[in-house]
Amino acid sequence: MVKGLEKFNELVESFANLPTIGKKTAIRLAYHLCINNQIDGMKLAHNIENAIRFIKPCEQCGALSENELCEICSDEERNKNILCIVESPKDILTLEESQSYNGLYFVLDELNEEKLEKLKQIILKLNISELIFALTHSINSDATIFFIEDKFKGLNLTFSKIAQGIPSGINLENVDLISLNKAMNFRTKI
């Protein structure tokens, strides 16, 4: 770090603490905002402050929201009979961007009795008929799915999980063996 530039060094350090930002990128960003475009720097500072102050988890599903209920939970056009279980609010952003799902969500960031009771209350209150698990493929997520399925087996629910397999545009030689195995075993007829 450069002596005598404590504020600049602190900004570089703050950027470098963010995911996927290395030191070189942090220096470029800090320089750009301090020297090349101070207006963008002020806007960024204002937007960060507002996001921290106003964005919170939706009280029902756990998605990012500026209100008690997020736009998804408040949307009357959504299919209120299906509930997609995800690991984080970021997963909701990804699924929404794909425009492949029109139901509700529930963020299961940790498996505990409080979360399970909240999930059960939502299922009963909204008369959910299907739980879709959109979790990262792992032994832990398989155990979580099995546990929830067993716990809620008396609620007349259909349980499903998102398909897994080979991503578009990837050569078979670059696919891990677990994904290739799943793709072969869960292939669809054409």
Swiss-Prot record:
Q: Does the keyword Nucleotide-binding apply?
A: no
Record's InterPro entries? DNA_Rcmb_RecR, Rcmb_RecR, Rcmb_RecR_Znf, TOPRIM_dom, TOPRIM_RecR
Q: Which UniProt keywords apply?
A: DNA damage, DNA recombination, DNA repair, Metal-binding, Zinc, Zinc-finger
Q: Which domain of life is it from?
A: Bacteria
Sorted alphabetically, the Gene Ontology BP terms of this entry are:
DNA recombination; DNA repair
GO function terms (MF aspect): DNA binding; zinc ion binding
Where exactly are the zinc fingers annotated as C4-type?
A: 58-73
Which protein family is named in the record?
Belongs to the RecR family.
| Residue ranges occupied by any Toprim domain in the UniProt entry | 81-167
Q: What is this protein called?
A: Recombination protein RecR
Q: Which gene encodes it?
A: recR
- Keyword check for GTP-binding: no
State the protein's purpose: May play a role in DNA repair. It seems to be involved in an RecBC-independent recombinational process of DNA repair. It may act with RecF and RecO.
The record ties this protein, via Pfam families, to: RecR_HhH, RecR_ZnF, Toprim_4
